[in-house]
């Protein structure tokens, strides 16, 4: 399972400028370029899992050509991770 979290971590870093993740306890974690390394996702996986680990909610991030229509809507799930 640590490998899946590592894939999630790698993908967040590569694709997104700012991300918001919600845990099962309701805590909202914002990951951006400045604070990215302060969040230990592997530790979080054991103590307070993410609500929907396959989905990431992008806010003010870069959009691809497919997601152009969502440029002004920051509450869309625009990225889905493959199950591996």
From Swiss-Prot:
Source domain of life: Viruses
Keyword Nucleotide-binding on entry: no
Location of the region described as Asp/Glu-rich (acidic) in the Swiss-Prot/TrEMBL record: 40-46
Cellular compartment(s): Virion tegument; Virion membrane; Host cell membrane; Host Golgi apparatus membrane
Residues carrying lipid (N-myristoyl glycine): 2
GO cellular component, one term: viral tegument
Annotated membrane topology: Lipid-anchor
Post-translational modification (record): Myristoylation and palmitoylation (probably on one or more of the nearby cysteines at the N-terminus) enable membrane-binding and Golgi apparatus-specific targeting and are essential for efficient packaging.
Main subcellular localisation: virion
Keyword field: Host cell membrane, Host Golgi apparatus, Host membrane, Lipoprotein, Membrane, Myristate, Palmitate, Phosphoprotein, Virion, Virion tegument
Gene Ontology biological process terms in this record: anatomical structure morphogenesis; viral budding from Golgi membrane
Family: Belongs to the herpesviridae cytoplasmic envelopment protein 3 family.
Assembly description: Interacts with cytoplasmic envelopment protein 2; this interaction is essential for the proper localization of each protein to the assembly complex and thus for the production of infectious virus.
Record function comment: Plays an important role in the cytoplasmic envelopment of tegument proteins and capsids during the assembly and egress processes. Also participates in viral entry at the fusion step probably by regulating the core fusion machinery.
The protein's name in its UniProt record: Cytoplasmic envelopment protein 3
Gene symbol of the encoding locus: MDV023
């Amino acid at each position: 399972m640590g490998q899946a979290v590592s894939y999630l971590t790698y993908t967040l870093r590569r694709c997104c400028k700012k991300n918001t993740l919600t845990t099962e306890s309701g805590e909202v974690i914002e990951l951006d370029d400045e604070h990215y390394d302060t969040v230990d996702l592997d530790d979080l996986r054991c103590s307070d899992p993410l609500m929907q680990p396959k989905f990431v909610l992008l806010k003010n991030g870069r959009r691809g050509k497919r997601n152009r229509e969502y440029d002004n809507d920051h509450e869309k799930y625009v990225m889905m991770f493959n199950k591996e």
